[in-house]
Each structure stands twice: as structure tokens, then as C-alpha cells.
Amino acid sequence: MADPAECSIKVMCRFRPLNEAEILRGDKFIPKFKGEETVVIGQGKPYVFDRVLPPNTTQEQVYNACAKQIVKDVLEGYNGTIFAYGQTSSGKTHTMEGKLHDPQLMGIIPRIAHDIFDHIYSMDENLEFHIKVSYFEIYLDKIRDLLDVSKTNLAVHEDKNRVPYVKGCTERFVSSPEEVMDVIDEGKANRHVAVTNMNEHSSRSHSIFLINIKQENVETEKKLSGKLYLVDLAGSEKVSKTGAEGAVLDEAKNINKSLSALGNVISALAEGTKTHVPYRDSKMTRILQDSLGGNCRTTIVICCSPSVFNEAETKSTLMFGQRAKTIKNTVSVNLELTAEEWKKKYEKEKEKNKALKSVIQHLEVELNRWRNGEAVPEDEQISAKDQKNLEPCDNTPIIDNITPVVDGISAEKEKYDEEITSLYRQLDDKDDEINQQSQLAEKLKQQMLDQDELLASTRRDYEKIQEELTRLQIENEAAKDEVKEVLQALEELAVNYDQKSQEVEDKTRANEQLTDELAQKTTTLTTTQRELSQLQELSNHQKKRATEILNLLLKDLGEIGGIIGTNDVKTLADVNGVIEEEFTMARLYISKMKSEVKSLVNRSKQLESAQTDSNRKMNASERELAACQLLISQHEAKIKSLTDYMQNMEQKRRQLEESQDSLSEELAKLRAQEKMHEVSFQDKEKEHLTRLQDAEEVKKALEQQMESHREAHQKQLSRLRDEIEEKQRIIDEIRDLNQKLQLEQERLSSDYNKLKIEDQEREVKLEKLLLLNDKREQAREDLKGLEETVSRELQTLHNLRKLFVQDLTTRVKKSVELDSDDGGGSAAQKQKISFLENNLEQLTKVHKQLVRDNADLRCELPKLEKRLRATAERVKALESALKEAKENAMRDRKRYQQEVDRIKEAVRAKNMARRAHSAQIAKPIRPGHYPASSPTAVHAVRGGGGSSNSTHYQK
């Protein structure tokens, strides 16, 4: 290391512009700038700094004033530090980072990343550089690696030169500005930020970006190294202004605590009278120990708010900057000497040691003469000038009484240093142990988060299943109502059918009675026909004329009135008209009977088709019920698997509790060992009470720190226990819900059995309806035979009518000659006619009754058809709903499978990322040569670029 030189900490003061909230609030702009180094707040005293940057200063101007020179110093072998200090929302992160990829608004860190490589490319080609970067944050007084989030509580150790460093922090080798920016982007994405009343993106941690540059001259083998700390501090907060609460309030407490420790270190260094500087009060001051009063060129950028609302905080920040400006650092070049240089330095120190020994010998001689009472003349006394000119003497060394005392003090000092070193070593071991425990706790926490995610997904699946079950229950109830309506309609139809069948049987019996009566009448008519045949034999000469009259009567019955001319004939004609009307009514009755029989046949066909559709729909309903039962069994299997999974989780929880108990036992053992060390240390303290006061203070600080770590560990364990109890409560709730689902499933099974029984009853009723349908077919055949019989009888009646008309015509013409015979014949004919009229009247009444019944049936038929159509539509709707439910179930099953695959992939990727910490390849950089385009290897090119060799370094 080169000879040290003193330098002061540079302090730059930057004021940001008023933000929108301050402008809307009407805050006053209070700073007044006097030159480039002085600022006055209100009517107060002036504050002088190395540079004052007003609000209109650009990011490039800030960089040129604050950081450009430090980059050159680091490349020359010095250590450098730049950190921003100020209250929250004062612009620290904007100053240090800005917008990372905006050429105009990027801050100090991205500009340094580009400027370092620009300087390297312009330097001597014989220089070879190795650059590695680290990025970590101090969150809740714990060091957290931003490039590997699994490292959450790293320890601070000291190297052989007593320089603090973060042990276990991830280091990335870089060879271009783009790689540095990638590292910054990766780390910034993992940094803690939050929203407060004063800042939408408030940093909740102190971030430190470390650039370690090693350079070697390949010709002279001269090696230089430099470190550059780029620190973005979290701002001090006043809770009444930020409105912090909950976790944000805890973060604010830790931020203010660490900033208070930084202020104490600055104050101790500024006063210069204190023998102890409290670097170990916080991890941030411990890391920045070299930057504050050590071997480092340090620049502090104090960021201030110009608003009168923050006047008190601004003045406090300015006072901090003035105190820091008085601190002196001792800087030297970090030079690694070669073997030849070490040899020269050794010879030089050896000669210097010889000269000092000779001076000591002369001084001891002079001291002995004084002690023996001899007065040493002034010319024989050794002055400061003579000490430099004295040569080493070869006389026999004089035994001095002071030498043993000096040796004893040196031995005690060495012993004291060894004890302090052992205490520091123990502290480092404790830090390592705490780091391991923290990583274990973080892994457990990550496992808990994974389990929470799985539990949440399980809960979502359960809710979906519950919704599906509810929907199926609603559809089941609706289907029950539909089935009840259909059954009711079928029952009504069956009752109506029974009534109509009974009526048809009654009408059939009436028709049989009428048939018997007609048979009797036929016999009577036969006798009458024989009599008429006898009369016909008597009137053959009138046969031709009677035939013509009969043809005329068949064409038009109205012509009978034109043939008959007398009053008697007119009366007979009226009687004949009545008979003709009754025959016509009989024909109409028969035709209506035909139409009714046809309508009954059509209706029977419709009922058969409706019955077929009902059977088909019932089969579809059975298939739907079977599918629903299959879905319920699948859900039962899924619930059973979830229950097994919850039992596995319970076993894991017990294992975690056992591991926790074992850790508690180990902690108790460590405490016992600590007490034993305390007892031994107290024994030593009695012997060296006056000399070990500083060691006692260090021990107290160590105990306090261990107590704080112990309390934090206990809190974390209690929090994990609470989380485990909460998970157990959730598992109990899921178990209860599972039991409810089982009860619901049993209820659905009972409903299904009831539906099955009802379905069987409906099948029995359908069989009865089929039997009734067969009876109806038989009745239809009987009606058909009856129709043929009636038609034959009507034909017979028609023939009788013809004969009767002929007889009447004959009797009208022979009325004068056969008066007495006609009187008797007329009485007999009148009796026959009245008998026929009575029969026709009865037939007419029967016909009218059948017409009314037919009309009633036709009125009832549209209602039944409408109800049947509604039932068919509902069955179609149920079929479509069932189809849609099946499709939704398939989609949900696919979505669930995709979600499970995604979670598995995420866990697998996370595990791969945790295992992916393999060795890295260092990337040497040569000035004058830009980085190669290949991402796999970087070529170190010698001067002139004629040859290249791929150089790799293992981390």
C-alpha cells in the first residue's frame, strides 16, 4: 500500500424543485443561494459546502460535480464512496438512480457504470481489469442480498487488514455497461418500497451497490485494486407527516435508528476527541467504516426539500452535512507489491530498525548515567539531530531495569489483542449462526407461503365444487318439479282417458241396444215389405211412374211438393218431408261418427308418439343421473385426497415443531456456554480490571446484540407457531366442510333413490296406459263394425222409404176407389211412421250427445298438447343444461389441471434457481478493446490486437 495522505469528505448539497403536493398546498420556496458553495434557509445563518446544487441542476451536472473525479480515483487504486442523505421524499433515489435507461434523467449509479468503461477503454492497453459487482440492501437492520433473495441475513466480517466486508454476498463479474445495468435492474426489482403520504415510491431500506475493480499491468505485473460504494440511504421519517402504520411504521423505526447511528458516528468523528467511534451500533455504519474516517475518498450528497413545510428537517440535514465536512479520511493507493518490491521494502525497514536500535542504546547509556547521579553535559546529550546521525554501536548492550516492564506491557497488550480478536471471532461465528438460522427461517417461511398458495388453490377448487353442487341441487329441484308436473299431467290425461273410455263403453252398450231394436224393426219392416210386395203386385201399372218419382225424390226432396196437388197429398208430403229430414239427420250422425272415430285414431297415434318421447326422455334423465352420480364419486375421491394431503401437512407441522424444539435446546446450550465464557471472562477481569474496560464495553455491546438477535429469533418462532395454529384452524374448517359435503352427498343419494322409485312407478303407470290404449284400439274396431252395421241399416231404411213413397203415390191416386181400405192402411202406416219417428228421435239425441262429448274432447286436446310441448321444451332445456354442466365441469377440470401444472413448474423453477449458484467466470477487460459480441467467452486482447486468448477465471 502506498504512503497515506489526508483528505476531507466532500459534501454536496442538492435542492429539489417543489412537487405537485407542495405547489397545491401553497408552500413557500425558502432556500436562498449565494454563489456555488453557500445557501441560506429563511433568515438563518449561511451553510457552506463544497458545492450547492439548485433545483434547476441537471442530472449530468450533478454527476460531473459529485462523482466524475471519484471514478478516476477508483481506477487509480483508491477506494471511493458516494452516498445520498436526507429526509424522505427529498430526491435521494432520483439522485443516485434516476430513470435507469433514460439518457437525460439517469442518476449517478448508471452514469458511473458507463463512465468506468469509457475510462478503461481510453487507458493503457497493457492493463487488464477484473470488475465484479454486488448489490444488497439493509432492511430492518438485516443485510439482504438483492441478487439472491434467499440470503436474507448476511453477516459483516473483517479481512486480514481489518476492513469490513459482507460475507456470502453474491458477486457478479461484468465486462460491459449493459451487464452492469442488467444487475442493477435485477436488484432494484427485489428492493423494498412502499407508499407514504410524502412519497409514492418510498425506499424502505438502505441499498449499497459495490463495484470492485482490480487491474494488473501485464508487463510490469503491478496490481491495483479499488472499491466503489454507491449508497442510496432510506430517508428519515416523521410519522406525523408520512402517516406510517403497521409494517411501514416498523420499517420507519429501523430506518430512523440506523440513521441515528450514522449521525452518532459522524458526530464522534467530527469532534475528534472521543476515543471510541460507535461503528458497530448498526450494520450500515459497520460496512461504511472505511468510508467514514478510513481509507476512502468519500462524497456525501445531502438532498433537501425547498418547502417551508419541511424547514426543520432541511436544517437538520444541512447541520449533518456541515459536521460531515469536518471529517478527515486517510487515503492510500491499494497496491499489491511484487516480490522484488517487498524485498526492497524489507531492506529499507531493516536499515531503519538498525538506526533506531543504535539510538535506543545511546539513550539507555545516557539514562543510566543520569540514574547513577552523574550529570551528563549538554554536548554529550543526544539531541534529535544527533539521533539521525548516530551509527549503530557494537558495544555490549546495557541491562536496563525498564526493559522487563516494557516487555510485560507488550505481552499484556498482545494478550489483550488476542482476546479482542477471539471475541470478534466469536461474534462473527454468532453472526454466521444467526445467518444460518435466518436462512432456515426464510426457507420455512417460503415453504409456508407455498403451502398457503396450495391451500388457497384448494380452497378455490372447493368453492367451485360447492358452487357446482349448489347449481346441481337447484337443477335437481327444478327437475323434480318438472317431473312432478309431467306426472300430474300424465295422471290427469290417464283420468280423462279412463272417463272417455267409460263413456265409449256406455255408448257402445247403447249402440248394441239400438242394434237390437233395429233388428226388431227390421223384422217388422220385413213383414211390412211383404205386405207392400202384395200391394206392388196390385199396382204394376204404376211402377214406372213410381220409379221416376223415387228418382226425383233422391235428387231433390223438394220436388215432392210439386207432384202432390190436393190438401191430403200436401199433408202426406209434409209427413214425407219429416221422414226425409230424419234420414238426413241419421246420415249426418253417421258421418260425424266417422270423423270422431278418425279424430280418436289420430289422437291415439299422438299419445303413442308422446309416450315414446317420454320414454326416451326418461332414459336421458337416467343417463344424466348416472353422470351426476359419477361426478359426485369423483368429488368424493378428490375430497379424500385433500384429506390425505391435510394429514401430511399435519405431520410436516409436527416435524417443524420438533425441529423448533431442537433448535431451542441448542440455543439453551449456547446460552450456557455463553455464561461459562462470562464467568471465565470475569475472572480475567479481576486481574486486569483497569486494562480491560474497553473489552467489557465490547462484551456488553455483544450481549446486547445477542439479546436483540435472540428476541428477534423468539418473535419469529412465535410468529411461525401462530401461523401453524392458523393453518391448523383452516384445516379443521376444511374438515368440517368435508363432512358437510359427505352429508350433502348422502342426501343426494337418497333423493336419487326416491327419483328412481318414482321412475319405476311411472313405468307401471305407463304400462297401465298401454293396456288402456289397447282397449281403446279394440273399441275403435268395435266402432268400425258398428258403423258398417248402421250404414247397412240406413240403406235398408232408405229402400223402405222408396217403397213407402211408391205406396203413398198409389194410395193417393186410388184414394176414392179404396176409401175403406185406405183408412185401415193409413192407420197402420201412421203407427209404423210414429214408431220410426221415435227411433230416429232417440238416435238424434244420442248423436247430439256424442257431438257434445267430441267438442269437449277437442277443447281439452289443445291444453294437453300445450302441456306436452312445454314438457318437451323443458326436457330439451334440461338436456342442454346438463350438456353445458358437463362442458363446464370439463373446463374446470382442465383449468384445475393447468393450475396444478403451473404451480409445479413454478416450484420446480424456484428450486432450480436456488440450485443454480454455480461458479462464475471472471471477464477480464483490456483498455482500447470493446467487449466481444459472444456471450460465452471474453477475449483479453494484447496491444495492437494481433492475438487474442480467451481467459476465464473461476470465482
Swiss-Prot record:
Keyword Iron attributed: no
Residue sites binding ATP per the record: 87, 89-94, 99
Organism in which the protein naturally occurs: Rattus norvegicus
SMART domains (alphabetical): KISc
Segments for region (Disordered): 909-955
Reaction it catalyzes: ATP + H2O = ADP + phosphate + H(+)
Protein family per UniProt: Belongs to the TRAFAC class myosin-kinesin ATPase superfamily. Kinesin family. Kinesin subfamily.
EC number: 3.6.4.-
Gene that encodes it: Kif5c
GO biological process, one term: mRNA transport
Name of the protein this chain belongs to: Kinesin heavy chain isoform 5C
Region Microtubule-binding, annotated ranges: 174-315
UniProt xrefs under InterPro entries: Kinesin-like_fam, Kinesin_motor_CS, Kinesin_motor_dom, Kinesin_motor_dom_sf, P-loop_NTPase
Entry GO MF terms: apolipoprotein receptor binding; ATP binding; ATP hydrolysis activity; microtubule binding; microtubule motor activity
Keyword list, A-Z: ATP-binding, Cell projection, Coiled coil, Cytoplasm, Cytoskeleton, Hydrolase, Microtubule, Motor protein, Nucleotide-binding, Phosphoprotein, Transport
PROSITE patterns in alphabetical order: KINESIN_MOTOR_1, KINESIN_MOTOR_2
Stored Gene3D superfamilies: 6.10.250.1590, Kinesin motor domain
Residue numbers bearing the Phosphothreonine modification: 403
Coiled coil: 332-366, 413-538, 590-913
